[in-house]
A protein has these predicted regions:
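Core alpha/beta nucleotide-donor-binding catalytic domains of modification enzymes
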Residues: 2-118, 128-132, 137-140
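Short, small-residue-rich loop/turn micro-motifs
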Residues: 15, 85-89, 191, 250, ...
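A generic secondary-structure signal for well-formed alpha-helical elements
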Residues: 26, 85, 131-134, 146, ...
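Class I S-adenosyl-L-methionine
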Residues: 70-80, 88-245
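Short aromatic/basic micro-patch
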Residues: 84, 121, 273-276
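Proline-centered helix-kink/hinge sites
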Residues: 85-86, 119, 166, 286, ...
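C-terminal target-recognition/interaction regions appended to catalytic cores
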Residues: 212-350
Length: 350
């Protein structure tokens, strides 16, 4: 960790998608997302397997604990908080959407750490459904509680596909800037129009074609086709466009589920699910990021993660709050992976 780096605490860190995007210094689809001046000094998550993956990939280990029981007085002082508070009760996939569910109140742990640590900036992520709950009253209530801790708060629906992620994933991003910081925040502008979206074929592993474990048996296909009462909508994928949103349920995917599947042979009705590595690429994880767990755990962690590439742009967009000025437009600061260049000094103080 550099002496003058900006210190970050990550709540609900999961396997580390947000953290990787915040730090930067990774490659994805022939592009290098340059190291940003952030360092994670504290990370916590309740999921033991997610923490196992996190600690396999990051220098600073995450703590496996219930964030509700963490004494924030005892963690390091930080410049920024990041956290994708659990969102099952807010998800459009969840038919219950019970706002009295305890999981719907975990954002209050963000409020609690803001009250104690007073960071200059915080970034939160949640599902699109949060905007729709009680006709927008829930997101406004959450924003008001953040504002009451002394922050100027903005939220916006961000489409990951517009930032080079090969997936039509939409997430609510909430950004707070402490009121005494002289910085007017703006969300990053979309970089790609629809005709330039990254297609799914760029992340599909041809080697998986020979691995039978990812294919649905013909018996399973016939059974799912005959279960008319359970049929929802088969989301087979067009390889020439971005993937539909992947979820944490990919290990249980069927041709009738809401998770995308690949139709390998239309004539023979041969289907397969994504491999964990393909799912990770769809989320914009670099191949260097490893998942040292079984497939079901990997699918869950990947589906719950924040796309690192999307988070890189969000993290870059708040640097002005810390006195940094970009040398040029952010999109010009991404170096082609194989181009031999010296390390870019992306941000200057002053």
């Amino acid at each position: 960790m550099k002496e003058n780096s900006l210190k970050v605490a990550s709540l609900f860190c999961g396997c580390g998608g947000s953290d990787l995007g915040t730090i930067g210094g990774f490659s994805f689809l022939e592009k290098d997302y340059t190291r940003l001046p952030f360092d994670i000094v504290y990370a916590v998550d309740f999921d033991t397997k997610a923490v196992e993956t996190y600690n396999h990939n990051f220098e600073h280990p995450a703590v496996c604990a219930d964030v509700c029981n963490v004494d924030f007085e005892k963690i390091p002082d930080v410049d920024m908080i990041i956290g994708g508070f659990p969102c099952q009760s807010f998800s459009t996939v969840n038919p219950t959407k019970d706002t009295n569910d305890d999981r719907a109140h975990l954002y209050k742990q963000i409020v609690r750490i803001l009250h104690i640590k007073k960071p200059k900036v915080f970034i939160c992520e949640n599902v699109k459904g949060l905007l729709q709950l009680q006709y927008g009253a829930i997101i406004k209530r959450i924003a008001k509680e953040f504002e009451d801790e002394g922050y100027s708060v903005q939220f916006q629906l961000i489409k990951a596909v517009e930032f080079g992620v090969p997936q039509k994933r939409e997430r609510v991003i909430i950004v707070g800037i402490r009121n005494d910081i002289n910085f007017s925040y703006n969300f990053p502008s979309p970089l790609l129009k629809e005709s330039d979206y990254v297609p799914l074929r760029k992340v599909i592993d041809k080697l998986a074609l020979d691995n039978p474990k990812y294919y649905f048996s013909q018996k399973a296909v016939e059974g799912m086709k005959n279960a008319k009462n359970n049929m929802k909508r088969g989301l087979w994928q067009d390889l020439n466009g971005p993937s539909l949103t992947i979820t944490s349920h990919l290990a249980k995917t069927s041709i009738n589920s809401r998770d995308p599947v690949l139709l390998v042979d239309p004539d023979k009705e041969i289907y397969r699910r994504f491999t964990p590595r393909e799912a990770a690429r769809i989320q914009s994880f670099p191949d260097s990021f490893e998942f040292p767990v079984s497939d079901p755990y990997a699918y869950r962690q990947i589906g719950n993660a924040v796309p690192p590439v999307m988070m890189w742009y969000i993290a870059s967009s708040v640097l002005g709050a810390f006195g940094y000025k970009p040398n040029t437009e952010v999109e010009h600061l991404i170096a082609p992976k194989h181009k031999q260049t010296k390390q870019l000094e992306l941000w200057n103080m002053g």
